[in-house]
Amino acid sequence: MIASAASAPRAICLLGPTASGKTAAALKLAERWPVEIISMDSALVYRGMDIGTAKPSAEEQAIAPHHLIDIIDPLDAYSAAQFANDANALIDAIRARGKLPLIVGGTMLYYKALTQGLSDLPGADPAIRAEIDAEAARDGWPALHAKLALVDPVTAARLHTTDAQRIQRALELYRLTGQPMSALLAREVGANAFQQHDAAAPYLTIALEPSDRLVLHARIAQRFDAMLAGGLLDEVEGLRRRGDLSPTLPSIRCVGYRQAWAYLEGEIDMAALREQGIAATRQLCKRQITWLRSTPERHVVDCLAPDYVDQVARLVQTSLESQSQ
């Protein structure tokens, strides 16, 4: 039990891009302190999606209690707002048990929702989404990315030309409001800057960032190959055989799954599956690092350093000691 849960950080947030060693570091912390782990990963919420998400094994999950893993069916959706609500409730419950909440993951929108709140943007509009999907089917997502660049160059500049989910949302918001998504978000941030800073203060945020991105890219390739060898295609084929899932769902849009689905549909060959899967993972990694670097309250640890786990532990120890004084 933590000596004084009231004096400890509200939660420790261990953030990092794909393949940065978050799980290994979290489990080492669990060996030293009485933590409960809250997953902050938009793919780990899905049941039956284990290999392509690098879900912690049953043995790993037995080391410490894990939360927000395997909580919904791939047919369903899970939002950043839902995560914030669930995580806040879990943090309070874990602290009440005298334990230390440890939030681990790389879904940075979830982190923003938890620590800063979300902007009050309009919800999804099925008619507009259907219209955008029809345009994409006819012209391709790169063409829609070009359309987005004309009306919202700031958002378009940070999106890959085939990032269907985010291009769709940005165009949807523009067509709903007549304003660029970037302007809507900037207005919200400006209006709530003080509250956001104040809300983020109780968290100890540690970011695992690579000193050499090429080394992380090599790790990503090795990891994707290991997923293929470990049965990713069989896992995705099982999802396809259900008959109620499609590549338009957020679950099947997850990196690795949409490429494997396309291969099983006969749309691409094995070489393209591997190439596209690795490229998509690297794009995800790039977005995650960009988000991390815009997080001023973080403590950076080089995830490629041989002693990176020890560095993380020292930051936690220092925080616990300073809070108890």
Curated annotation (Swiss-Prot):
Q: Which reaction does it catalyse?
A: adenosine(37) in tRNA + dimethylallyl diphosphate = N(6)-dimethylallyladenosine(37) in tRNA + diphosphate
Q: Where are the transmembrane segments?
A: none
**Per its UniProt entry, which superkingdom is the organism in?**
Bacteria
Where is the site labelled Interaction with substrate tRNA?
T107, R129
Per UniProt, the keywords (alphabetical) are: ATP-binding, Magnesium, Nucleotide-binding, Transferase, tRNA processing
Where are the annotated coiled coils located? none
Where, in this chain's numbering, is ATP bound?
G16, P17, T18, A19, S20, G21, K22, T23
| InterPro entries noted in UniProt | Dimethylallyltransferase, IPT, P-loop_NTPase
* Gene Ontology MF annotations: ATP binding; tRNA dimethylallyltransferase activity
Cofactor(s) needed = Mg(2+)
- Region of interest: Interaction with substrate tRNA: 41-44, 165-169, 253-258, 286-293
Could you say which EC number(s) this protein's record lists?
Answer: 2.5.1.75
Q: Name one Pfam family in it.
A: IPPT
Q: Which residues bind substrate?
A: T18, A19, S20, G21, K22, T23
GO biological process, alphabetically ordered: tRNA modification
How does this chain assemble? Monomer.
| Role | Catalyzes the transfer of a dimethylallyl group onto the adenine at position 37 in tRNAs that read codons beginning with uridine, leading to the formation of N6-(dimethylallyl)adenosine (i(6)A).
By sequence similarity, the record places it as follows: Belongs to the IPP transferase family.
Descriptive protein name: tRNA dimethylallyltransferase
Q: Identify the species of origin.
A: Ralstonia pickettii (strain 12J)
For this protein's source organism, the top of the classification is:
Bacteria, Pseudomonadati, Pseudomonadota, Betaproteobacteria, Burkholderiales
> What gene does this protein come from?
miaA
